[in-house]
Amino acid sequence: MARPQNHRRSNWTERDDNDDYLFQRFLEESETRHSREPSPVTEQSQQELQQDVQQAIDGIFNSLRRNMSSTSNINRAANMDATTNGNGGINADTIRATNANTADSPFTARQQSPLRTFLRNLFILDYFIGLILFPFSVYNILRSGFNSMTFSENDFIIEIVGYWKFAKIFGSGGTTLIAYKDTGKLGLLGKFHNIIVFYSSPVIKHIMKSRDGNEPNLNWIRLMFAKAFELFVKVSTILIYLAYGVSGTVYMVTAGFFFVLCLLFTVIRRYKGVHRMLVSQRITGPGVF
């Protein structure tokens, strides 16, 4: 009986050893299987990476397709413009001609708002009124400038006309030259007259001396020289008077405008300085307002 029991014990021990061996083999195979099979997290990250790469490649191809299509459209449009350029001018000319020949009917014309029409007519009226009143304003400015420059109380046109009609160059005998006093009514015109007569008197002396000679045939020539000299003196006096008055008026207007402009700039700068001071005091200081 001892031998069968020993045989049974040996079988049991061998069976236990085989079970341990098989269990170890199972554990090893399961570990190797887990190491070989990728984890779901890594699989998901790899799938996302592949999707991103695929989207980037698709975007590159789409941009290339768009660029190719845009270049083809530009070339096609350039070819169409080159082919239709000659016909376009003819068609435009014909369209302009037809539009010029066809009158706008009240049914097809675009109706404007009454306020816009009223404002346009008002601006046109103001423009024409300005054109009409502009010469009068210029005349008033010149008149005030002449009066202030020439120290005259009368109108400069009236003074010029009076000088042209009543001023005389030669005396009653025709051998003397007339010079007007400072207390006369001609004013500054009389002074300019005296200056021109004084500086041109040597030229006319020969004519005045030889007027009573024994050459009757040359009397009419001397008379013509006298008339020309009288005309020269009057025209020169009036031109100098006008030049003096206009230049003085322009100078006064320019100086006044410059003075007003400087005063305006000064007031604006002072106002800005005061405004900055008030703003800074209101921001930094205690509440005043």
UniProtKB/Swiss-Prot annotation:
Post-translational modification: Not glycosylated.
Biased composition (Basic and acidic residues): 28-37
Alphabetical GO biological process terms: cellular response to amino acid stimulus; proteasome-mediated ubiquitin-dependent protein catabolic process; ubiquitin-dependent protein catabolic process
Entry superkingdom: Eukaryota
Transmembrane spans: 223-243, 248-268
Main subcellular localisation: nucleus
Record's function text: Part of the nuclear inner membrane (INM)-specific branch of the ER-associated degradation (ERAD) pathway, required for the elimination of misfolded proteins in the INM, a specialized ER subdomain. Required for ERG11 degradation. Negative regulator of SPS-sensor signaling. Together with ASI2 and ASI3, prevents the unprocessed precursor forms of STP1 and STP2 that escape cytoplasmic anchoring from inducing SPS-sensor-regulated genes in the absence of inducing signals.
Complexes and interactors: Component of the Asi complex, which contains ASI1, ASI2 and ASI3.
Perinuclear space compartment spans: 244-247
Presence of the UniProt keyword Nucleus in the record: yes
Keyword field contains Nucleus: yes
Membrane topology: Multi-pass membrane protein
Topological region Nuclear: 1-222, 269-289
Lineage of source species: Eukaryota, Fungi, Dikarya, Ascomycota, Saccharomycotina
Keywords: Membrane, Nucleus, Transmembrane, Transmembrane helix
Name this polypeptide is given: Protein ASI2
Native source organism of the sequence: Saccharomyces cerevisiae (strain ATCC 204508 / S288c) (Baker's yeast)
